[in-house]
Amino acid sequence: NYPQAATCAENALKKDGLKRVATLSELGQFNNRSVGDVLWAFEYIASQAALFGSFVSHMAIDGTYGSSAPQCFDDWLYEEGMTDADERRAWATLPAESPLVADDSDFKDAEIHWQTKFGYQNASTGVADIINLRAEEMLLTLAECKCRAEDYDGARSLLQELYDKRYSEPRDISGLANSASVSLDTHAQPQTLLDEI
């Protein structure tokens, strides 16, 4: 029900004091509940934290599972899907370039892009923030709803609002077709507006 989803997204974006789009420098690590774009989050405190089995333990390369079974960026996404101006590239690193990867790690020389987006506030105790919903997700939900309602200018405007904070230089999406059709090929450049969303 796209009209209802659009209404819900619009209402969520009206939250007092909400920052609709945070920059990567404001976000730091992605799971920081004190950033102004957070709509819904909670904090694992030391007495509640589980070092093994939590979402963060699987994601954080300074943690438990994540340090020995790292979550990696798809090479195509990093090399082709993201332009040099896409600041999200800062959330990926080669193990050799990360101080969080031990020098004697079997991964140190691997040519894979590890995600550094998620981490612990304190890896020894398991203290971490868990983010359940951000303003940017509502912005993208609203953009999709506008696209499906054939309000392509409205959808483009919302994407531009996001891109103004996430790209170091303007992102040109003028060549994308005004269409709510979507490709099923995850290793292809977007052709339609909905592909981009």
Predicted regions: what they are:
Residues 77-78:
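Active-site-proximal, Lys/Arg-enriched surface segment
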Residues 1-59, 65-67, 81-197:
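Acidic/polar-rich alpha-helix caps and helix-coil junctions
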